[in-house]
Swiss-Prot record:
Biological source species: Levilactobacillus brevis (strain ATCC 367 / BCRC 12310 / CIP 105137 / JCM 1170 / LMG 11437 / NCIMB 947 / NCTC 947)
Protein keywords: Cytoplasm, Initiation factor, Protein biosynthesis, RNA-binding, rRNA-binding
MF terms (GO), sorted A to Z: ribosome binding; rRNA binding; translation initiation factor activity
Name recorded for this polypeptide: Translation initiation factor IF-1
Assembly and binders: Component of the 30S ribosomal translation pre-initiation complex which assembles on the 30S ribosome in the order IF-2 and IF-3, IF-1 and N-formylmethionyl-tRNA(fMet); mRNA recruitment can occur at any time during PIC assembly.
Function, in words: One of the essential components for the initiation of protein synthesis. Stabilizes the binding of IF-2 and IF-3 on the 30S subunit to which N-formylmethionyl-tRNA(fMet) subsequently binds. Helps modulate mRNA selection, yielding the 30S pre-initiation complex (PIC). Upon addition of the 50S ribosomal subunit IF-1, IF-2 and IF-3 are released leaving the mature 70S translation initiation complex.
Location relative to the cell: Cytoplasm
HAMAP family the UniProt entry points to: IF_1
One GO term describing the cellular component: cytosol
Segments forming a coiled coil: none
Main subcellular location: cytoplasm
UniProt gene name: infA
Length: 72
């Protein structure tokens, strides 16, 4: 999958789940499951409920995504 096929949206973390998974509510009202990208995991960036994040989603499965950025 090429990088250009990725859909980037902003959302808010509503719930933390086991195995570094999060439930994220997107700006358009949809809720998805998202996991943490490797760079965020590598730099020990904590993600808590209420944080605003950027999520990358595949056009093939719009119910899952990857958290790529946490806003300050």
């Amino acid at each position: 999958m090429a990088k250009s096929d990725v859909i980037e949206v902003e959302g808010k973390v509503t719930e933390t789940l086991p195995n570094a998974m999060f439930r994220v509510e997107l700006e358009n009202g949809h809720e998805i499951l998202a996991h943490v990208s490797g760079k965020i995991r590598m730099h020990y960036i904590r993600i808590l409920p209420g944080d605003r994040v950027t999520v990358e989603m595949s056009p093939y499965d719009l119910s899952k995504g990857r958290i790529t950025y946490r806003f300050k």
